[in-house]
């Protein structure tokens, strides 16, 4: 081995770590980190000092955030279930999604927004359930108020979403605020859009009091909607995401195509076009669609033509147990038999290239 290279060789893994592009939100890996709060705070790679401080100071909040990761990743996978990129996660990768989010694409915009929303949702819910020392129900919702139906009393436990938003902003945005590059600004914008999305679906719920439920007196509280509403809303924002470029002074965005409107704080923004995700690509972090189940009768993104990228599909027949011949019995039960059902399953063919199965 060449002498100068021999001196560098022991340091090569560290040098590669420094030079490799990085996905900012390493806190996503908190889902996979068990043990005490100290173990979690010290072993999640990539946290900046502010995030570690908050982690050590608020271990109960970190547990809520860690549990919330599973919820928002499941929501991401639900929204992308019929698409070539299906929000698949990598258990052994501290970025959770691998290299696919290194590209400043619409998919990256959605993941940053849904993850930020997930933190708000998880913290706010934990507050209302009395699981956090630093917060409880919304202290501002007290006394009497009015709405279109008349006067009511604040009661019950209103979700303290403002606390959830403040903590999420401090923790999630900490790493991006240390950077001044375009990607950091993109992430901050989409993080904020995600937080705002949760608050958008805060709803007033009421209980009537009076003779025979006459509603002479109402007690009301504010509650977050099911997280699916936030996911559906951000999915619509993903489909309408706006491609942007940095402005000349590097402090904000301008639309890449002048025919499109300027993005609002609720919109998702991105810089780069997405890959087609058709084949496994180590550099792009794309797992490809070989082996994915497709829908032969669909004309949408889950159709065999679109999902398989024109490569064709294989068909296999499987059997599964289903309920059949169900009958209503008085009173009051439905009884069914177990039947075997045969059905065809269509899966995308692999590319003809010999290296398609190379691990990412």
Curated annotation (Swiss-Prot):
Its main location: secreted. Disulfide bonds join 76-87, 127-135, 137-157, 206-220, 208-215, 278-309, 294-304, 308-348, 324-339, 326-336, 331-332. It is found in: Secreted, Extracellular space, Extracellular matrix; Secreted. A lipid is attached at residue 212 (O-palmitoleoyl serine). Keywords: Developmental protein, Disulfide bond, Extracellular matrix, Glycoprotein, Lipoprotein, Secreted, Signal, Wnt signaling pathway. InterPro entries: Wnt, Wnt2, Wnt_C, Wnt_CS. Palmitoleoylation is required for efficient binding to frizzled receptors. Depalmitoleoylation leads to Wnt signaling pathway inhibition. One of its GO terms (cellular component) is extracellular space. SMART domains: WNT1. Residues 1-25 form the signal peptide. GO terms for biological process: atrial cardiac muscle tissue morphogenesis; canonical Wnt signaling pathway; cardiac epithelial to mesenchymal transition; cardiac muscle cell proliferation; cell fate commitment; cell proliferation in midbrain; cell-cell signaling; cellular response to transforming growth factor beta stimulus. The keyword Signal applies. The keyword Signal applies. Pfam families: wnt. GO terms for molecular function: cytokine activity; frizzled binding. Glycans are attached at residue 295. Belongs to the Wnt family. Ligand for members of the frizzled family of seven transmembrane receptors. Functions in the canonical Wnt signaling pathway that results in activation of transcription factors of the TCF/LEF family. Functions as a upstream regulator of FGF10 expression. Plays an important role in embryonic lung development. May contribute to embryonic brain development by regulating the proliferation of dopaminergic precursors and neurons. This is Protein Wnt-2. The gene is WNT2.
